[in-house]
Amino acid sequence: MPTSTAAFPLIRAHLPLALALGAAALVAAAPARAMLHYEGIAYAADGKQVLYRESHWVREDGARLVLYQCTNGAAFARKRVDDGSAAPDFELVDARNGYREGVRRSGSGREMFSQAKGQAERRAPLPKSTEAQVIDAGFDAYLRQRWDSLGSGGPQRIAFVLPSELRTLDFRITPGPADAEVQRYTLSLAAWYGTLLPDLSVAYTRQDRRLREFRGVGNIRDARGRYPSVRIEFPERLRGQADAGAWEQALQQPLVAQCSAR
């Protein structure tokens, strides 16, 4: 949710649900069985312009590999998510600006880290929280786990981990409009300054609880280093199966330092 305000200077912080909505300790080899593969298309929030694409591979154990691709198909960033829990270790690397961030094991605990190109790595212990802690794509797992209680009760609060700021922010999840096919949820900051920031919204299919759309500030910076508002669609037609070879190819795929025109 990277919006700069005088009242809250660290609104560079963002909510990476775009998601599905990378990890240092990830096992590199994928199993031989087929795995889920799907794609997302990120549009500018105010129009039909395609900004980038996401290609997701999800193993049976919930581990996830994501390539972020230019409009010409070249990959510029990669994310590895350790497992399918609500608070997994992960690592995101963007070759365009040399930025990296994530959460990893450290000694007997865990730590957040981030690093801008040419700068020293910043790190801090993962803070404790009285709220349910959610990390990166773990938001998807959280929604699936709490689906029934979210639908029947009031808003729920989560502590979302923001490695870019080395802290957490409390968010409120509120069920939105629903119909026979789609359930929507709205995420807003659970603080007095929450009205200063735009809400995030996600839409899930009710039948199989599949993410269909994300609207809000994304987790991928633009050419100016800002986090733009995006609308990411996850079409059913771009959903299928892949084998272990596809995982390995995505893991070894070179990342470009600049997106060129088509």
Language-model segments: residues:
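Acidic, serine/threonine-rich low-complexity disordered tracts
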Residues: 35-37, 46-64, 68-86, 91-98, ...
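Short, extreme N-terminal leader segments that mark the start of a protein/domain
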Residues: 30-41
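An exposed acidic His-Trp-rich patch
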Residues: 97-126, 226
